[in-house]
Curated annotation (Swiss-Prot):
It is found in: Cytoplasm, Cytoskeleton, Flagellum axoneme. This is Dynein regulatory complex protein 10. It comes from Homo sapiens. Disulfide bonds: none annotated. Residues 90-125 form a coiled coil. The gene is IQCD. Its main location: cytoplasm. Component of the nexin-dynein regulatory complex (N-DRC), a key regulator of ciliary/flagellar motility which maintains the alignment and integrity of the distal axoneme and regulates microtubule sliding in motile axonemes. Keywords: Cell projection, Cilium, Coiled coil, Cytoplasm, Cytoskeleton, Flagellum. Component of the nexin-dynein regulatory complex (N-DRC). Interacts with CFAP52. Transmembrane segments: none annotated.
Length: 449
């Protein structure tokens, strides 16, 4: 609606705009006229606004589910596995009640149609009895409609307690009628209007009001221009009236002729009036009978109202007892919860104390571990030094053994060489003697030959 007003605003400002020259400075252009209606926020900030929107969203969600109940009833085999037995049982009961209501309404319309057809031919007493039976049947529709309302609430309660089934049902949008979809679209549109209203801050509302006042002021200026134009029109109308007066003379002659025609029609009007009076008397008698019947119905409705009040009082007492019982159980559960939470808190404190002690002991063990690591590193360094010294000593011992062995070998070699040298000297003398003997033997052999 606000956008429509803004769309019409330039039409009201047309006379003033036409007076402005075509050349304007771009740097001096006015601000955006729609700026006061642009919302500065996109999200709700107050709890009350969020609650209002959540209530409306919940209502739309329930309407979406209720409008699909007829589709569920007509596709029971396909939907039974998706929604469950409890929901399908409630839907079948709801469908049975709706069928009973539709059958009663159809029968009631049929009786009213028959009564309308036979109203002129039958007697007045018989008509009263038929009308009384129809009214009684109409009064019996109210409890049935209440049962249908309760059944609808029961189906919604079961669907809301089973979110998965509700989501599956909500996806079956092809089963919704066009009228139901239009109703849901209207609710969604209402939600958009309400959301925009809740997003509007008091400052924005004042700006919008100021903006509308400016538009109203511009409208008043335009109205002054219109008044001026109307004055010009009035002057021209005076000139036109002079011409009209000339034509009025011709019209007056036609009226005289019409007056004569009306005189002839007065007789027929009198006859029609007499017939209307007769019909009025007949209608008055019928209305008296109808008033008596309505008074009887009022007495019956008053007795039904008293009975319903008594029944509702008994139901209210039962609900009050049930409410007191539920509140007592809730208090017991709260006390039990507080006791258990106290025990859990004590246990948590004990565990926290044990945790702190374990943490302190862990720090002590870490400190000792650092000391032991330092001692271990020192011992390992000492062992490495000792092993190096031992290896050096062993290597020195090996060198000494090798040197002693070498010295012994050299000494033994020297002794052997010296011994061999002495033996060679003695052997040379013996060899010379042997050679001399061999030569002599050879010479003797040659001489024998």
């Amino acid at each position: 609606m606000a956008l429509d007003i803004l769309a019409m605003a330039p039409l009201y400002q047309a006379p003033a705009i036409n007076r402005i020259g075509p050349k304007t400075d771009p740097s001096k252009r006015p601000a955006d006229p729609l700026k006061p209606l642009v919302l500065s926020r996109t999200k709700l900030t107050t709890i009350e606004a969020k609650r209002i929107m959540s209530i409306l969203d919940e209502a739309i969600y329930k309407v979406e589910l209720v409008t699909l109940l007829s589709y569920v009833a007509s596709n029971r085999e396909d939907m039974e596995g998706m929604l469950g037995e409890d929901v399908m049982r409630a839907v079948r009961e709801h469908e049975d009640l709706c069928q009973v209501l539709l059958e009663n309404v159809r029968c009631l319309k049929e009786k009213e149609r028959q009564l309308q057809e036979q109203k002129e031919a039958e007697e007045e007493g018989w008509l009263r009895d038929r009308l009384l039976s129809i009214e009684l049947q109409k009064s019996s529709l109210s409890p049935l409609m209440q049962q249908i309302k309760d059944s609808t609430k029961n189906v919604l309660r079961l669907l809301l307690s089973n979110p998965q089934a509700a989501r599956l049902l909500q996806m079956q949008t092809q089963g919704r009628s066009a009228e139901a979809q239009n109703f849901i679209d209207s609710l969604i549109e209402l939600r958009g209007f309400l959301f925009e209203k809740l997003l509007t801050s008091p400052m924005e509302a004042r700006d919008k009001a100021q903006f509308l006042q400016d538009i109203s002021r511009q409208n008043s200026n335009n109205q002054q221009i219109i008044d001026t134009l109307e004055k010009e029109l009035a002057e021209r109308m005076k000139n036109r009236n002079a011409e009209v007066e000339k034509e009025n003379f011709v019209i007056q002659e036609l009226k005289n002729h019409l007056h004569q025609v009306l005189k002839f029609s007065e007789n027929s009007l009198v006859r029609t009036k007499q017939e209307a009076e007769k019909q009025q008397k007949a209608d008055f008698r019928a209305s008296q009978a109808r008033v008596a019947k309505i008074q009887q119905e009022i007495l019956q409705l008053q007795s039904q109202f008293y009975n319903l009040v008594m029944e509702n009082r008994e139901a209210e007492q039962a609900l009050r007892k049930k409410k007191y019982k539920v509140e007592t159980e809730i208090e017991n559960w709260i006390q039990k919860y507080d006791t258990e939470m106290g025990e859990k808190q004590e246990e948590l404190e004990d565990l926290d104390a044990v945790h702190r002690e374990e943490k302190i002991s862990l720090e002590e063990l870490r400190r000792r571990h650092k000391v032991l690591v330092g001692e271990f590193a020192q011992i390992r360094e000492e062992r490495e030094i000792n092993s190096k010294k031992r290896m050096e000593a062993e290597q020195e011992m090996v060198r000494m053994v090798r040197a002693a062995t070498l010295i012994q070998a050299l000494w033994k070699g020297y002794l052997v060489r010296s011994l061999l040298r002495s033996k060679k000297k003695r052997g040379k003398g013996k060899a010379k003697d042997k050679e001399k003997g061999k030569q002599k033997g050879k010479e003797k052999g040659k001489g024998k030959k």
